[in-house]
Amino acid sequence: MVDFPTRFDVIVIGGGHAGTEAALAAARMGVKTLLLTHNVETLGQMSCNPAIGGIGKSHLVKEIDALGGAMAEATDKGGIQFRILNSRKGPAVRATRAQADRVLYKAAIRHTLENQPNLWIFQQACDDLIVEQDQVRGVVTQMGLRFHADNVVLTTGTFLGGLIHIGLENYSGGRAGDPPSIALARRLRELPLRVGRLKTGTPPRIDGRSVVFSVMTEQPGDTPIPVMSFLGSKEQHPEQVSCWITHTNARTHEIIAANLDRSPMYSGVIEGIGPRYCPSIEDKIHRFADKESHQVFLEPEGLTTHELYPNGISTSLPFDVQLQIVRSIRGMENAHIVRPGYAIEYDFFDPRDLKYSLETKVIGGLFFAGQINGTTGYEEAGAQGLLAGANAALRAQGKDSWCPRRDEAYIGVLVDDLITLGTQEPYRMFTSRAEYRLILREDNADLRLTEKGRELGLVDDRRWAAFEAKREGIEREEQRLKSTWVRPNTPQGEAIAERFGTPLTHEYNLLNLLSRPEIDYASLVEITGDAVDNPQVAEQVEIRTKYAGYIDRQQEEIARLRASEDTRLPVDIDYLGISGLSKEIQNKLNQARPETLGQASRIPGVTPAAISLLLIHLKKRASGRQLEQSA
């Protein structure tokens, strides 16, 4: 074996969405970082659907962006269609979604990586970890080259023991065209960590030249075109294109039902559990037998290819059945399949064996992020990657770890759910998972997180200057609206009265008027003049004003709960010795080893009464130690 001459502070294994964000985060924080990938050409590759964002997911993308990450800016540079989902609903559940050109997105990520100071990239698969006395010391590559670092972030995606299924045939692979990580999977199974198998899948890709779009429903992007990054602008976007909607039908369902015995999922060949919220088409037909059709979205893969991604018909059925399925769908009667769909099974590790920092509890300096933790989705992976990379850097600097709370970020919700509850199926983020979603909107991710990102060293001068200008702009505009008055029987007063449908009875300041449901910011400044030129400032002023009462109530609730949420539980606490706790709860707490009282309260089966007993125990323990010190 040969030792690489440079010693690193942090090594990141894997160049997908988790790995790239992890490596960039650590390097931005000033530590010497190595990104080890099996193929430099696939850095930032979108292995599944060509899209970023969506319900719950865009909140994560905006939080990554607020902390200086790359995903949102790469989306603005590679996005070929942008839409706001839930635009008619409240701001808490609105979400930005973008179709991305695979080539442009990947190029944007690679450009960011290659221009990041403190970051080295090396092409080699990782086969082994160097571990000494329960502390990671480095990694060993496929060719026996040893890289040394006391902090290693594993972001292996679907590569650990990856097994690809098409019909009843299967073969080893990390994804189509890439080898799996067999040696590393074997090495990780030797560690005292709980391991399981999960499964995900992808649909066949279609040649757009063989599709009849005229019989489908066109789905254009939104106008005006949204942006994903807080620093983004629509001028960055390439050419914008439409998606197309068609549907499965009775014939499609008959074909699938007649061939379920050839499905690896239904014949017992696949052991791993698939994603509940992104089921295969055979799973949909089986689980929702009463439905006569299912939507299929034809999504362009890019501007320089004819390939289409038929979102909604992920499948692992044999190729001959896939061809029948595709050609049974309206508009695709003569479609040509460019690549077959497939399912992939892979190893994941129980995230309950992780700390909030995403460091494993049993091996110091070893961090996990992405699908290795049981999640699904680029956005979930990127969020974990950024957090793991930042905490690996903090550890290298001898500083305390950091993780946002559930009331601070969707990243906090994601991590808390994973390490407290674990997961038996691929975990996907939804806004419904957050208790405080009115506070955790996608539009205010920067106001929630950028200041902390700056403190950690994640946020550069360009982003910080833009953030400060926005924050000051919001305060200035709110103050202006508060101090500007409209009186009855004036031209402005009459215009406002006409909008309300009733005369003004007394004078109002503009902030009071904006809080009324009948008027929005654009209409208000149309009447009174002096609009701000930053649309993000205008958006924040309007949301904060209209939802002030609800936001204040949620903030009060958060303040009440924060005391118990932040109460740390000692690492050496003996739950078996706490009288009053049932054996079941003692065992649950002993196994989970929660870090805070708040986390303990979310463990299934741990009752409010048990939390009260824990609090009493902590107070007794603290007073006992004070007596010892005074004696």
UniProtKB/Swiss-Prot annotation:
Q: Which PROSITE patterns match?
A: GIDA_1, GIDA_2
Q: Which UniProt keywords apply?
A: Cytoplasm, FAD, Flavoprotein, NAD, tRNA processing
Where does the protein principally reside? cytoplasm
- Entry's localization field: Cytoplasm
**Where does the record locate the signal sequence feature?**
none
The residues the record assigns to binding FAD are 14-19
Q: State the GO CC annotations.
A: cytosol
**InterPro entries (UniProt xref):** FAD/NAD-bd_sf (IPR036188), GIDA_C_N (IPR049312), MnmG (IPR004416), MnmG-rel (IPR002218), MnmG-rel_CS (IPR020595), MnmG_C (IPR026904), MnmG_C_subdom (IPR047001), MnmG_C_subdom_sf (IPR044920)
Write one Gene Ontology MF term. flavin adenine dinucleotide binding
Listed GO biological process terms? tRNA methylation; tRNA wobble uridine modification
Q: Which co-factor is required? A: FAD
Q: Where does NAD(+) bind?
A: 274-288
Give the domain of life. Answer: Bacteria
Under SUPFAM superfamilies, the record lists:
FAD/NAD(P)-binding domain
| Subunit architecture | Homodimer. Heterotetramer of two MnmE and two MnmG subunits.
| NCBIfam families registered for this protein in UniProt | mnmG_gidA
Q: Which family does it belong to?
A: Belongs to the MnmG family.
Write down what this protein is called: tRNA uridine 5-carboxymethylaminomethyl modification enzyme MnmG
| The encoding gene | mnmG
